[in-house]
Amino acid sequence: MEQRDYYELLEVSRNASDAEIKKAYRRLAMKYHPDRNPGDTSAEEKFKEIQKAYNILSDKQKRAAYDQFGHAGVDPSMGGGPGGFGGFGGFGDVFEDIFENIFSGGRGHGRQSRGQRGADLQFNVQLTLEEAAIGKEVEITVPRHGTCTVCEGSGAKKGTSPKTCETCQGMGQVRIQQGFFSIQQTCPTCHGEGKIISDPCASCHGQGRVRESKKINVKIPAGVDNGDRVRLSGEGEAGVHGGGSGDLYVQISLKKHAIFERHENDLHCEVPISFATAALGGSIEVPTLEGRVTLKIPAETQTGKVFRLRSKGMKSVRGYGQGDLLCKVVVETPVNLSREQKELLNKLQDSLENAKGTHSPKTSSWFAGVKKFFEDMKF
């Protein structure tokens, strides 16, 4: 299957800057994201292609290889390109790892050390259930390595710039012919960076990044749950020597609620009702995240009965649908009764015992079971 040009996929020119590529990726990723196109397989495939294109073009060395060799330069299964051993497919990388470690003194791939990407970071945010229900924008302060503003991430002293390594011509790797094998190894001059910094920046000591604490506004969508994460692309650690920045993951946790328990998008709660309301029926007010609502209790309601209030739970974090509120009624036993109240209850009990059909089906079944048990045991 013919692969599309990565620049065409991101709708940018071949000389587009890193910032232009990143901007185009964000726009297209938002447009074709599966959450915005549920059930649309073509949009999902487009999203995957866009991600793959960005992964290549956002990496300086991969982009250089792609510009020079096309898809073969970044796809080991296609053969050719700077990785070599293309005819062996996956075996090429195995041989390359072995020989590269031998000839480079164990430093590993120059591709990995050159323009090293910054690490991903995680920041924990705790919300109340009410905040999670409607979403919230929070300001967080993240300690991290940020791009050095003095050298703008280059690592070179202001007014100067890194020079292209003459040994590897900026590729970070050189080839050595060993018999039948053409062996690729890390450039011994620039150690895989592709550039030489002769006069490093005093602020970042040539690293291109410095420690900082950055304030970031995070929009947390409605419906988030424990363990959900919000990804902020490029807000992690800045890369070394101009490498791409990592991502920031905001980890969500919810505080325990005094009334509701959450099960996915449904909310559960227990609602106490009086003995009289359970027997005779009535109406009670129950709380929801949107305010109070009236719940009708039918006569002869038993404790443990669950009433479902549709669409009174949590919104789906994907933006469609809403859970329910399940109210479990608990019949209260009256306490601190007066003498008169006790006498009335005794009279009620006597009248119930002498009347037939006043027990609930569950109670009648239980008494019948107990009676049969004693008969079988012949007590």
UniProtKB/Swiss-Prot annotation:
GO biological process: chaperone cofactor-dependent protein refolding; DNA replication; protein refolding; response to heat
Zn finger region (CR-type): 135-213
Cofactor: record remark: Binds 2 Zn(2+) ions per monomer.
Main localization (coarse): cytoplasm
Domain J residue range list: 5-70
GO molecular function: ATP binding; heat shock protein binding; unfolded protein binding; zinc ion binding
Domain of life: Bacteria
Subcellular location per the Swiss-Prot or TrEMBL entry: Cytoplasm
Residues annotated for Zn(2+) 2 binding in this entry: C165, C168, C187, C190
One Gene Ontology cellular component annotation held by this UniProt entry: cytoplasm
Positions bound to Zn(2+) 1: C148, C151, C201, C204
Stretches forming CXXCXGXG motif repeats: 148-155, 165-172, 187-194, 201-208
InterPro entries listed in its UniProt record: DnaJ (IPR012724), DnaJ_C (IPR002939), DnaJ_domain (IPR001623), DnaJ_domain_CS (IPR018253), HSP40/DnaJ_pept-bd (IPR008971), HSP_DnaJ_Cys-rich_dom (IPR001305), HSP_DnaJ_Cys-rich_dom_sf (IPR036410), J_dom_sf (IPR036869)
Keywords for the protein's UniProt record, in alphabetical order: Chaperone, Cytoplasm, DNA replication, Metal-binding, Repeat, Stress response, Zinc, Zinc-finger
Pfam families for this protein: DnaJ (PF00226), DnaJ_C (PF01556), DnaJ_CXXCXGXG (PF00684)
Function: Participates actively in the response to hyperosmotic and heat shock by preventing the aggregation of stress-denatured proteins and by disaggregating proteins, also in an autonomous, DnaK-independent fashion. Unfolded proteins bind initially to DnaJ; upon interaction with the DnaJ-bound protein, DnaK hydrolyzes its bound ATP, resulting in the formation of a stable complex. GrpE releases ADP from DnaK; ATP binding to DnaK triggers the release of the substrate protein, thus completing the reaction cycle.
Subunit structure: Homodimer.
Free-text comment on this protein's domains from its UniProt entry: The J domain is necessary and sufficient to stimulate DnaK ATPase activity. Zinc center 1 plays an important role in the autonomous, DnaK-independent chaperone activity of DnaJ. Zinc center 2 is essential for interaction with DnaK and for DnaJ activity.
Protein family according to the UniProt entry: Belongs to the DnaJ family.
Name of the protein described by the UniProt record: Chaperone protein DnaJ
Organism: Legionella pneumophila subsp. pneumophila (strain Philadelphia 1 / ATCC 33152 / DSM 7513)
Gene: dnaJ
